[in-house]
């Protein structure tokens, strides 16, 4: 018979898998009406000053202690500072919208609104629009501010969760993030779901995308 600790571990594992599936389903729903559009040009990636602004905005949101289903999440999704999806239903319930990309869009509010609206909502959109451009860089070249797409077990080939890197890869094969719509360390130091910080393994990285100066408003 399993011990209590073993059962608790299994429950936690199952909860994480359910969350992954729900997130993937919500992102798939976002992309259902998407039609193929002309891909952006291929520029040369490089460091830009706007990175510091993006990281500061992400850090400020983490310090706000945004916990599911905080009304602040609706700002990430529907206002012009985030995705700008003003037509989306008001966010009131945990799991209602896969908002990891919306949080990245809010951090990167300096990016043109049309790009945030069209590309930031899902992993698939990043992959289909930026995957074959020079914005897509080798994971080993990751820098703070890069948009990092990760995959959990049995995830989609284009990834299933959007994060913002706050570090380069470390020697132990991990990197640091601030991200939304995930479970990790909240701004008050507790563990919960919302805007969180996390140490993630590089082996889960699917793609790394870097915003360029020409993407800025």
Regions found by a protein language model. Give the residues of each.
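N-terminal capping segments
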Residues: 34-111
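...with weaker cross-activation on analogous glycine-rich loops/strands in unrelated enzymes
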Residues: 114-187
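Active-site signature of cysteine proteases
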Residues: 169-217
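Short intrinsically disordered terminal tails
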Residues: 1-2, 142, 215-217
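Heptad-repeat coiled-coil/leucine-zipper oligomerization helices
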Residues: 3, 10, 17-20, 24, ...
């Amino acid at each position: 018979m399993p011990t209590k600790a073993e059962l608790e571990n299994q429950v936690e594992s199952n909860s994480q898998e359910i969350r992954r599936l729900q997130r993937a389903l919500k992102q798939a729903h976002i992309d259902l009406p998407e039609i193929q559009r002309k891909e952006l040009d291929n520029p040369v990636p490089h460091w830009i000053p706007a990175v510091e602004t993006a990281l500061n905005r992400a850090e400020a949101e983490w310090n706000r202690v945004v916990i599911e289903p905080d009304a602040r999440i609706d700002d990430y999704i529907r206002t012009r500072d985030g995705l700008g999806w003003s037509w989306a239903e008001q966010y009131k319930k945990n799991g209602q919208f896969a908002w990891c990309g919306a949080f990245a869009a809010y951090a990167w509010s300096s990016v043109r609104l049309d790009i945030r609206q069209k590309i930031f909502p899902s992993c698939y959109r990043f992959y289909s629009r930026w995957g074959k451009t020079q914005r897509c860089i080798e994971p080993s070249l990751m820098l703070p501010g890069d948009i990092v797409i990760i995959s959990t077990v049995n995830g989609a080939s284009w990834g299933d969760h959007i994060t913002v890197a706050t570090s380069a890869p470390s020697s132990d094969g991990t990197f640091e993030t601030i991200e939304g719509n995930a479970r990790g360390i909240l701004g008050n130091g507790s563990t919960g779901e919302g805007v969180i910080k996390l140490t993630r393994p590089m082996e889960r990285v699917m793609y790394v995308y870097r915003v360029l100066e020409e993407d800025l408003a």
